A protein has these predicted regions:
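Hydrophobic positions on the alpha1 helix immediately C-terminal to the Walker A/P-loop
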Residues: 56-59
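Hydrophobic anchor at the beta1->P-loop junction of P-loop NTPases
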Residues: 45-47
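Charged, amphipathic alpha-helical linker segments immediately N-terminal to NTP-binding catalytic cores
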Residues: 1-20
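ATP-dependent carboxylate-amine ligase catalytic core
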Residues: 18, 24, 31-32, 37-40, ...
Length: 155
């Protein structure tokens, strides 16, 4: 079981805006400066809607895993620990990885919201996993302008 990582999340909340901004320009610019890691992710399934997204994502995850498929997931919000948002194959992301990817993203010197930062952390971490993994990505707000709507051909 994960131990709470409130300290790191509280620090992120202070450092990054939590306001909603329905614009994909910033996150796309950051990803471009990082050589478009989102393009390395295959089998992306965007889960959208107003209710039940996490239930659908969890059901799909268990179905795929029961069929010996590798699965990465990105969800929000987390219930207990920020690492719960990031499932990579068979484990949650580590705090060390979160810090590592945060530093990489900060080197772009572009200002992001907290959700944009977390989305970029997911993309960078998932891009390092098996290329045949399924990537189940829960949308945050509105699909068309949502930070998770970055792939040209999601499943």
């Amino acid at each position: 079981m994960l131990q709470p990582s409130k300290k790191i999340y509280q620090k992120l909340q202070k450092q990054y805006s939590r306001r909603i901004n329905l614009d994909l320009k910033r996150i796309k610019k950051v990803l471009e400066k990082l050589n478009n890691p989102e393009e390395q992710l295959e089998n992306v399934i965007n889960i959208i809607g107003s209710d039940g997204k996490n239930s659908v994502l969890t059901s799909l995850k268990y179905f795929l895993e029961a069929n010996n498929q590798k699965v990465n997931t990105f969800t929000s919000p987390h219930l207990y620990d920020v690492r719960q948002r990031f499932w990579l194959g068979n484990r949650f992301i580590s705090l060390k990885e979160i810090k590592k990817y945060k530093k990489i993203i900060e080197r772009t010197r572009l200002k992001l919201t907290l959700f944009e930062l977390l989305t970029c952390i997911y993309i960078l971490s998932a891009a390092k996993t098996d290329s045949e993994s399924y990537n189940l990505v829960e949308s945050g707000l509105l699909f068309k302008k949502d930070r998770t709507n970055l792939w040209t051909n999601p499943l």
